[in-house]
Amino acid sequence: MDRKELELYLNDLLQAARFRDYCPNGLQVQGRDPIAHIVTGVTASLALIEAAIDVRADAILVHHGYFWKGEDARVIGQKHARLKQLLAHDVNLFAYHLPLDAHPTLGNNAQLGALLGIQPTGRFGDDELGWIGTLPEATTLGAFAEVVAARLDRMPLVIGGADRPVHTIGWCTGGAQGWFDAAVSAGVDVYLSGEASEQTTHLARESGVAYIGAGHHATERGGVRALGNHLAEHFGVRHTFIDIPNPV
């Protein structure tokens, strides 16, 4: 398919223009045309780029791309190494950050909720990026944490008593521990995100709302993989999801 056609389709599907983001969404590095093979991954790391080159991908589609607000604009060091490989092999790089968190079916939050068996009931936070939902049956924090560990193949950080009853879940993938306060105000029993900060522990203890830190990378694998599968089905392109392990 044509590179411009893909970019326009993704921008429209993910409603990229409506988000005030920390980075440019869409095509970040131009490569060859046409595009027949797309590799997806969470972050445009050098390891992902090299893996995509090895399988002869025409484009890479990620959640974490480049050119973040406030970063050093010089093309040196790590940035040089990554861009050098993309440009030398004429590989396109597409990146969608907040738009890929928010999509109602393909987004990170939608995919994580489905993976954990949560029925969505509402949203909260800026651009309604935070999600609220309920479990089919009330359970305990310990039992729910076991489900999280099994589905994400990673032991989560759990703040709260294992026997605490939970039914209403708030969640936002990635580094959204800063939205814990908003989740508490929304009346959830437990809030789940990817990371935790020092103050997260105190808020959990003092609010009575449990917290689960399930991994920034682990909670954000679903969206880009689902989006790649959608593109393969819609356009008939080849799609390969490559997971570069990350313990954070």
From Swiss-Prot:
Q: Which domain of life is it from?
A: Bacteria
Q: Name one GO molecular function term.
A: metal ion binding
Q: Name one GO cellular component term.
A: cytoplasm
Which residues hold a divalent metal cation 2? Answer: 64, 216, 220
- Listed Pfam families: DUF34_NIF3 (PF01784)
Identify the residues that bind a divalent metal cation 1: 63, 101, 220
Print the keywords alphabetically: Metal-binding
Q: How does it assemble?
A: Homohexamer.
* Family statement drawn from the similarity comment of this UniProt entry: Belongs to the GTP cyclohydrolase I type 2/NIF3 family.
- What's this protein's name? GTP cyclohydrolase 1 type 2 homolog
